[in-house]
Amino acid sequence: MAENWEPKIVGFCCNWCTYGGADTAGVGRMQYPPSIRIIRVMCSGRIEPSFILKAFKEGADGVFIGGCHPGDCHYDAGNYKWQRRVMMLYDMLDELGIEKERVMHEWISASEGEKFQIAMNDIYDKIKAMGPCTLKENTGKIDE
């Protein structure tokens, strides 16, 4: 692995909370790695395991999912839906030979810019230490 390798990380962030936390971090000029790409979704409950698998298939080395704190979901129970789906996702990742540690989820409100910054730096450091995702060599397995 090259020393200057930068992990590609995709972040799916809830519009109502975590995306607001990202905005708060930006307004506060809090730094996090530029190789993290944020995708705004209306709710973490809208995130399907197929979204995460597609991110890995397209070259992501790690995936972050951010949602509202339990009990604070704009759509009442979206974050609980994500919590149920993540267990199924971990089983899929295991079958594909992808470490479940490559997926991180966190509850971050719009006012928690510092928590967002810390989460981004944490996933970056963790994925950087793990190295590139090996799925790229086994991409065909996702289509099966």
Swiss-Prot record:
Tell me any Pfam family this protein matches: FlpD
Name the cofactor(s) required for activity, per the record. [2Fe-2S] cluster
Keywords carried by this UniProt record: 2Fe-2S, Electron transport, Iron, Iron-sulfur, Metal-binding, Oxidoreductase, Transport
Induced by what?
Answer: By selenium deprivation.
Task: Give the enzyme's main class according to its UniProt record, as a single word.
Answer: oxidoreductase
> Carries keyword Iron-sulfur?
yes
The molecule here is called: F420-non-reducing hydrogenase vhc iron-sulfur subunit D
Q: Gene encoding this polypeptide?
A: vhcD
